[in-house]
Amino acid sequence: VGFKAGVKDYKLTYYTPDYETKDTDILAAFRVTPQPGVPPEEAGAAVAAESSTGTWTTVWTDGLTSLDRYKGRCYHIEPVAGEDNQYICYVAYPLDLFEEGSVTNMFTSIVGNVFGFKALRALRLEDLRIPPAYVKTFQGPPHGIQVERDKLNKYGRPLLGCTIKPKLGLSAKNYGRAVYECLRGGLDFTKDDENVNSQPFMRWRDRFLFCAEAIYKAQAETGEIKGHYLNATAGTCEEMIKRAVFARELGVPIVMHDYLTGGFTANTSLAHYCRDNGLLLHIHRAMHAVIDRQKNHGMHFRVLAKALRMSGGDHIHAGTVVGKLEGEREITLGFVDLLRDDFVEKDRSRGIYFTQDWVSLPGVLPVASGGIHVWHMPALTEIFGDDSVLQFGGGTLGHPWGNAPGAVANRVALEACVQARNEGRDLAREGNEIIR
């Protein structure tokens, strides 16, 4: 027929309701709010087009490739119950659109360009189905849940952590002292705050040295393995790796990274280094609410959590369900399972849009952190189960008798809750009795 220039509706090419999804497709569920007068089919097709092979007009070079093989397809649209003019649009992407082992490229393709789109009032990526064929191109977490338990020799209970406060302003020696007191009192881990990197009042090398000293002293006195999440996040990837190398030379068990501000490329590099050198990797999600807070625009945290499991991390902050940063319980448990389990069934009541098979990619320990304290312990033990890290910052350091007694209180409460649970008592009902 020859080439025919001109602008045509996206839905003629990219809306394909009879498409059968392939096992190798990456599937996305978008919450689409079209501008007034834009039909949902056109909006959904526009998203599929702009995040795959399409552009705003027909181009001559389309004839040089097979669009049928490479285009994203909007294959199903359903209205959102209780919302006016909101639709869930399902889009299937052929696997060949993505570079192997690159979360960076996956996000650049799927969410890189479409969110500023004129035809849409708002757009939110609710979930992704990562096919096993793509999962297998990722190393994933450096070690995973089982290997971590074996390294630490801690079984049958959640792990306990504490963020050292005040987060900024302590000297390295005083910081190390706080670390020692918490670990000595019974915590498994202490943590650098996400914004502790290398500032004038405390340079990273000094902090690493004093924290290592605190760890070894506490280990010698308690006979337990201890750790402190040494934040290796830095302004350049090279500097980040340099800090991780120094941590390894000190012989400490774990380092930490802010994966959203640091970026997925840096995070994946660090995860590879950690696996090669036997370091655990704790991940903080600083900046996540910029992306996931709005209900109708941005990206749901479950997508960021899946991406982290692919990029690599052994722990990730995942909300609390109780405390100051409360999350909706079922939804939170949905992405907690996506982090830990090997296979998760589709379950819309928990916000899970697709069945996800992780094909033995190691699991990530969810970290409950943010405004929780010792009276939340029964609820946390029940909600999160054994494979989790419970992190009390002010809930440890705010104890009227000081840091070490605060740590003791948390450890005693945790042991009491685990014992009561194992004896078959009802934590939800008798929680306060148990820890009193």
UniProtKB/Swiss-Prot annotation:
PROSITE patterns: RUBISCO_LARGE. Binds 1 Mg(2+) ion per subunit. It catalyses: 2 (2R)-3-phosphoglycerate + 2 H(+) = D-ribulose 1,5-bisphosphate + CO2 + H2O; D-ribulose 1,5-bisphosphate + O2 = 2-phosphoglycolate + (2R)-3-phosphoglycerate + 2 H(+). The disulfide bond which can form in the large chain dimeric partners within the hexadecamer appears to be associated with oxidative stress and protein turnover. It is found in: Plastid, Chloroplast. GO terms for biological process: photorespiration; reductive pentose-phosphate cycle. Mg(2+) binds at K191, D193, E194. SUPFAM superfamilies: RuBisCo, C-terminal domain, RuBisCO, large subunit, small (N-terminal) domain. Its cofactor is Mg(2+). Its main location: plastid. Belongs to the RuBisCO large chain family. Type I subfamily. Heterohexadecamer of 8 large chains and 8 small chains; disulfide-linked. The disulfide link is formed within the large subunit homodimers. HAMAP family: RuBisCO_L_type1 (MF_01338). The basic functional RuBisCO is composed of a large chain homodimer in a 'head-to-tail' conformation. In form I RuBisCO this homodimer is arranged in a barrel-like tetramer with the small subunits forming a tetrameric 'cap' on each end of the 'barrel'. This is Ribulose bisphosphate carboxylase large chain. The gene is rbcL.
